[in-house]
Every structure is written in C-alpha cells, then in structure tokens.
C-alpha cells in the first residue's frame, strides 16, 4: 500500500488550518487517515507548525512519501534533514515570543502614570471591628480609674 504524508484542510474561509496526516495515497484530501502526526496554521504570525518528530521519522523510514507542502514543513522543522542525514537538523522554525502578563502591563502603566506601584495593584477595604468589641473597650478604661479612686479612698 502506497502511503503519503499530506495535509488535511480545516478551518473557515480565508483562515485555513491543516492537520498533517499519514494516509493511503488513493484517499481523497479529507479522507480517512491512518495517523495524524501534526498541525499547521499558516495565518498565525509566525506560522504554527507542530509535528511529532518521532512519528514523522518512523513513517519516513517505512517508506511514506511526503507531498510537496509537507516536505517544505519537514525541512523547516528539521525532520527531513535528520531523516536524510544532512546538516542543519535543528531546522529554521520561528518561535512566537511569550506575551507579557496583564499584571506586568498594568504595573508598567501605573509606573508611567504616577510612579512605582505601592504594593498590590488593588488595595482591599479595611474591615471594621465589631461594634460589641468597640463598646467593651470603651467601657473598660472608664471602669479602671473608678476602681483606682475607690482603692485610694479605702486607704
């Protein structure tokens, strides 16, 4: 059975997303796959290319033929060079930079506005002490001087 590594199209109009799959060469583009080994999103910046390198190496070793678009992707990831034993097996895949967290952006904007942040970005409300505790504290100091004056009178 002739096996090909090819792309299956997914996604909306003008926003293609592809699965990289291993399938019989005689099946249609969206036909039944033997195995899905990766995905490719060309519209993202930089393009998302995820290929399970171990499975791609296996299928290439047993004779699966990649189509031209898949061959280009395998060269970008370095899997084709690794399979052929050529230099440059690390590939030329670009990785997206991680986004800064929203808290960091908020603190940076706050620092620009009026200076460095004072602790947390949002201050919590102070909880009031229960009214009974306040009343007990207010009565206690008033009773102590009266007790002292009673002790002084008895002496």
Swiss-Prot record:
Pfam families: Ribosomal_S16 (PF00886). Residues 113-155 are annotated as: Disordered. GO terms for cellular component: cytoplasm; small ribosomal subunit. Residues 136-146 have a biased composition (Acidic residues). GO terms for molecular function: structural constituent of ribosome. One of its GO terms (biological process) is translation. InterPro entries: Ribosomal_bS16, Ribosomal_bS16_CS, Ribosomal_bS16_dom_sf. Keywords: Ribonucleoprotein, Ribosomal protein. NCBIfam families: PRK14520.1, S16. Belongs to the bacterial ribosomal protein bS16 family. This is Small ribosomal subunit protein bS16. The lineage of its organism: Bacteria, Bacillati, Actinomycetota, Actinomycetes, Mycobacteriales.
């Amino acid at each position: 059975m002739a096996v090909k590594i090819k792309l299956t199209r997914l996604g909306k109009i003008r926003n293609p997303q592809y699965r990289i799959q291993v399938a019989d060469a005689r099946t249609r583009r969206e036909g039944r796959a033997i195995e899905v080994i990766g995905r490719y999103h060309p519209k993202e910046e930089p393009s998302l290319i995820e290929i399970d390198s171990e499975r791609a190496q296996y299928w290439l070793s047993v004779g699966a033929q990649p189509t031209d678009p898949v061959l280009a992707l395998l060269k970008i990831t370095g899997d084709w060079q690794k399979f052929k034993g050529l230099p440059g097996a690390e590939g030329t895949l670009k990785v997206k930079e991680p986004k800064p967290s929203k808290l960091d952006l908020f603190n940076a904007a706050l620092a620009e506005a009026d200076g460095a942040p004072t602790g947390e970005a949002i201050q919590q409300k102070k909880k009031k002490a229960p009214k009974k505790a306040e009343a007990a504290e207010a009565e206690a100091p008033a009773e102590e001087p009266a007790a002292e004056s009673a002790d002084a009178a008895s002496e």
